[in-house]
Amino acid sequence: MQTFSNINLVKPSRDWRVEKGDIDENNSGSINNRPLSPTLFSSNSSNNNNNNTTNNYIAVNGNLVLGVNGVGVGEQAQSLDIAVENPEECILWYYNYFLGKSHQNYLGTLDNGDVFGASIKKEEYAIEGEYSYKTIIWTLEGIERQWFQLKKHASTTPTDIIKKALPRLQIKKIKEIDSPDLLKDFKDLEQTQTEINYKFGLLLARPNQSSEDDFYNNVEHSPKWTEFLNLLGDTVVLNSFKGYRGGLDVNNNTTGTHSLYTSLKGYEVMFHVSTMLPHSKADSQQIERKRHLGNDIVIIIFYDCDPSDPIIPWDPSTVNSNFNHIFAVVRPADENNYHVEIVIKHGIAKFGPVLPTHSIFPKNSTFKEFLITKLVNAQRAALNSAPSFATKLKRTFKDQLESIYKKHSSSSSSLSFVPKRRSSSVSNINKGRELKVKDPKYGSGFFKLLSKDSNKTQVFDTEILFSKSLNEKINCLDVVESDENNSTLIVATEESIYLLKSNMITGEQLFQKIIVMKDVIRLTLVKPLKILLVLTGKGLCFFEMDTIFQQFNNLSTNSTIPSSYAIPIPTTPTTSNNNGGSGFFSSNNLSNGHTSLRWSKSGIIAAGLINNNNNSNSINSINSNNNNNINNSSINNNNGGNTNILAPSVFLSVNNNNNNSGNNIFNNNNNNNNNGGLNNSSENILTVIGEDSIKVKKIVGTKGCTVYGYTKGDNEGQEEDITLLYVGLKKTLLLYEWNKGEFVKSRELPLMDNIKTLCAIAPGMICVGIQKEFLLIDIFTQTIKELYKKSDSEPVKALSLDNEILLCFNNIGIFVDESGNKTRQFELKWGSTPSSLALVPSYVLGISGPLIEVRTLLNGNIIQSLPANISLSNDDCNLDNHYHHHEIINNCSAINIVNNQLSDNIENINNLNINNNNGNNNYNNNGNNSNGGNNNNNNNNNNGCNNSLINLDQETNNLMSENSNNGAENVYSFSTFNDIAHVDNGNIYVASSSKGLSCILRIKQNIQLNVLPSPSSSPLKPSLLLPPSPL
């Protein structure tokens, strides 16, 4: 019996390449095919600041680009990252985010004579003083979508915004067009670029057959063939079929009576099954069958044979069709598995998902999902990169755009600039909504299809690690330690530095202020030196981590009243007491009032004070002075009674509150609460540093520094190894060396322009971004080499990978080697300019203000955008991943209060007063006097979405009543620690602050899903596999 590794289903051909799992035939010259070598640069640089990310794998032996879920030695399972690439192509930006909303449309010409269009949507951004701009640039090369922020005081013209979105455009003339017809033209033009329905051919082959004519003449079904068809889809009756028909006759049965149909992730697929199409004995070439399958871009060839049967390898060079570009050849490997090889015509770009080792699949739904996803990506890759398709599609799009320009340029109403932005008028907004109602195909219904079972196929999962109402924004963070279940982070806000310890299993957390320091821009934990490096507007300084941990332990474990007091994190949503009175927390399920506590080794983490409806109690107050302590306050219920808090190390703190009533625990913002209530102080966790202050050590000569990086010669941190610190100070690059507990300046190098970004490559070697270009600098020899230059773009970030460097200009990412030569044929086209980059095996993440993009390193395509909406529910603070379009663009992230209850993970929403009179709750942002009556949820900011959990079906039905300012206040701004976010064990931590709510998110690859077992007769090759993800 043949083994899986030496069976060839396809004969090698000069014009075709073959993917078979561990070998990429005819592709030995690919840059991704070079074996891994010891890392040249990044293992000791600050860009991998935890010094355990040396395995920045790009590829292993061709297409084996497994994620962090790779297989280790002795394991018999592989995980599959199954994702449709570039899903935003099916999320019509103009249809969903512009049409029916206030926006401007422009048409213009470039210096070279080409025409272009632009659509701009301006919104209030979550960060005060900034506007958010969504832009669509319609060029002859295609559609470019960008999302970015600009300062309100910045003087921006339409040309400035368009240049920001697409810097390479050299605009000669532009004008705003006020025409309802242009709304429809742009909507229709975008839809021509969207493909959500697919037709794939299915050919039956026998063991002794090798030609297409033999395949097309097969008629009889067999159990193996029927089993394969049933796995792929459902047999449907064509007569009166209402789904996507793929060119088949659904009225007169001229193309057969039945066919095979399926839908997956919102995409409809009709298979052209050769044995279900009409067969003519008199026609040896079966022209009627070829009329359908011959026009399909993707074909599946299934060999109906036993695993032991020898087959003649199929020769793809015998294909006669000009349309057939990708073939999936499948045969039974044994009773429970299939063997698959993918045949691709040369000239087509690479696409995923990547085949597993030996390409053996079990006969289950995972195989169906993988195969159809692979074929969907294959057809898209062929249309975009195969010359025969791409040239024709580009020419068609060019003709359509030029026709639109000619149509509206000749209109007398469009010959001049529109002075008052009439394209934002009510009439145009209503016209857009009417167009959406008339054509709902790409609206809510499609989104709902896309979201079906989406959580099962997410490559990356996002979870909220921490959320809190703070009056200070989280600026940056770094990781002390992290694993699957625990994490310790250092978090810097606008006012202070905190230490956050979390247990993901128990939900226990401790968020402790340790240093009061304003305006921290960036911080880095330098583990070999055991220091915390901090950048502020006054320059660089550092703290000894041992002192920080000692301070943290003193503050968090002392069983007596320490010099810091922390408000306990609530564990139960606040509810009303049906018997009257006001309780901190109430419960209908408990018979006696008690204190709910969460403990950890470092002390109490959260405490919820629970009062029972039947026993109205009050909590004895803690008496202390007015200075940063509780002022003789308590919570009283109408029926009296007392419950003592017997909980050591639980302390409450406020800022000099003025309590007008003995029934108030907290009083702030001059609020008056007649029957007792909870008023949050302006800072929900207040910590006063103890007498033993933490000493700060300044790094002389760094005032005005904007960027920095470091390298360490040895990961183990040997004392004799010198740590080098690189500092960008305006037009000067400074070098500091660690010497006896201090950073001492040893060299400086003047440059011709201000340093915008820098990336440590190796000891003494730095990649520096200045205006329009990146430089490679050897600071010891003072050698400056031009690495890569783009005259129309600004450098943003650089990231050192194994054997190559990722350079980001505005919204373009380019891979180069140390000589500046491109190492990859593709570019990363970010949807929003990244402020940070994170690298995990097989993927790179771009973190920007509005969203996080996950792109595959196989071809640069986007496979996921995250996180989706952050919302509050009565159970938890959740990431709403339900609707697929929210994963593509975080268009409306609203803080949501469901059923008048706050999440137990969101503590003390800013300026929230809760007064319970006669069992009624009031939620008010401005602190109203509440004497009872009705349930109120008052919010004076009504400019944005009020509910992030949008019912998209209702959205389509209610288009005429939409708020034109939808989304104005509900977009979250994401920031991350340092220049990247890659941390221990593949965990990525990102901070988000918006409207007083601060969150820390953990992103990790989904290791629970799509695990592909390998049969015992197919031993894996450990040498070709990435290391397993630690648990």
Curated annotation (Swiss-Prot):
Domain Rap-GAP: 186-404
Protein biosynthesis recorded as keyword: no
Domain CNH: 471-881
Extent of Polar residues compositional bias: 26-41
GO cellular component term of the entry, any: cytoplasm
PANTHER family, per the entry: GTPASE-ACTIVATING PROTEIN DDB_G0291510 (PTHR15711:SF67), RAP GTPASE-ACTIVATING PROTEIN (PTHR15711)
Protein name stated in the entry: GTPase-activating protein DDB_G0291510
Species, as recorded: Dictyostelium discoideum (Social amoeba)
